[in-house]
């Protein structure tokens, strides 16, 4: 079919929630805000709890929907199960596989053309998903250490530093995406002069 170009806006941020609600044959009602006790949000919470092994904290994110607070270790556990659905509780194995394969078939629908998510999923056996304020999650389907789940957070929330760190981390784990825009990207001042660059120096410690 014909591709449609559009600029994602506020109305697109809750599309997956509405689609899930309709898939369950429930009437769609208009709500000014997404609420944590809505059936879809309760299902999201239960799913994340089952996959992370922890009870997440709750807040409201930039899209005005309930969001969850987890330690990086627990988030990485959930991404590991996305990488290796056969290790997940039985009820989640097929859904995880479907989500994983859908994201890998259509990586440009995850974060848009030109994003680090899209590039990594096009080039490597990974599922990649960025989040707000320097957050990143990775499911490595294969590699020198087998399937892995990774959760990363840049403490000050810097977006560009996150991308640089993710690419460097994948290389350190034996998955090289090749040349990317996030290899030593320049830092420029207000006049546009290059005054430095960003570089990730990693020291991995396995626990």
Regions found by a protein language model. Give the residues of each.
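Structured C-terminal helix/loop/strand segments within mature extracytoplasmic catalytic/sensor domains
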Residues: 82-207
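Active-site-adjacent helix/loop patches that line small-molecule binding or acyl-intermediate pockets
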Residues: 1, 13, 22-24, 30-54, ...
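Surface-exposed beta-strand edges and their flanking turn/coil or helix-capping segments
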Residues: 21-23, 31, 71, 75, ...
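A short glycine/serine-rich beta->alpha loop
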Residues: 60-65, 152-156
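A generic local secondary-structure boundary/capping motif
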Residues: 36, 48, 64-67, 124-127, ...
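Bacterial peptidoglycan biogenesis and beta-lactam-recognition machinery
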Residues: 38-60, 66-67, 73-111
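Alpha-helical structural signal
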Residues: 11-14, 100
């Amino acid at each position: 079919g014909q591709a449609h170009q559009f600029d994602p806006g506020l109305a697109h941020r809750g599309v997956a929630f509405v689609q899930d609600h309709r898939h369950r044959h429930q009437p769609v009602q208009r709500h000014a805000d997404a609420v944590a006790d809505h059936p879809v949000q309760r299902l999201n919470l239960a799913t994340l709890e089952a996959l992370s092994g922890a009870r997440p904290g709750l807040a409201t994110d930039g899209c005005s929907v309930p969001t969850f607070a987890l330690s990086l270790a627990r988030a990485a556990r959930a991404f590991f199960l996305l990488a290796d659905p056969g290790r997940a509780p039985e009820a989640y194995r097929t859904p995880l596989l479907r989500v994983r394969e859908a994201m890998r078939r259509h990586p440009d629908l995850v974060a848009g053309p030109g994003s680090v998510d899209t590039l990594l999923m096009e080039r490597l056996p990974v599922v990649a998903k960025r989040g707000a304020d320097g957050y990143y999650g990775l499911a490595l389907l294969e590699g020198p250490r087998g399937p892995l789940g990774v959760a990363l957070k840049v403490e000050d929330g810097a977006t560009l530093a996150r991308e640089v760190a993710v690419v460097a981390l994948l290389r350190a784990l034996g998955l090289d995406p090749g040349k990317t825009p996030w290899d030593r990207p320049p830092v420029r001042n207000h006049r546009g002069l290059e005054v430095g660059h960003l570089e990730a120096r990693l020291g991995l410690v396995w626990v």
